Amino acid sequence: MASTKEAHRRKAANGRQDPCAWPLLTRENFERLCFERSNLRCVLCGGQAVDAHHIFERKLFPDGGYRLNNAAALCSPCHWRAEIGLDTPCAILAACGLDDPLPPPHAAAAGLSPSATLSHMDKWGNLTRSDGSIAPGPLFQDDGCRKALAAGGRLGLCYEAGDFQCSQIDAPAATRKK
């Protein structure tokens, strides 16, 4: 199993950012290494970390996304805020000091650049548009996603969409989900 430093060396050695150069971990190692990296402190508030949070939902990845560049040690209140979308992946990645995040595969397929992914995508793979509405992502029908959006007061901002495309970031919301 490679360490965080080894993953960074691999990235530097090949001269480009390769998020998948980070090794795929078991669930147990994902949690252990996440907590070790943060010294058991929440990366957002500095409190006691109790959850190894997937920055982007693990269901978005065919392999489960158990890589350290998709992990953040969070306390319970910050974990809840991250799950319901009040703390964004962009903010969490910055707090972790990660400059090579693991973007969900559907982001590239939709034509999103890494910076657009970080700026506009929530934990569940939905796109937040410039007008504040939300273009549903591939997990929109997932019970966990819908419960999180509802708990965060964001479910009413979603509109029904066909294909998930990068053009949805700035396009007007024709129909919003009621």
Q: Can you say where each PLM-predicted feature lies in the sequence?
A:
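A boundary/linker detector
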Residues: 1-39, 46-49, 88-178
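Histidine-centered nuclease catalytic patch
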Residues: 41-73, 82-93
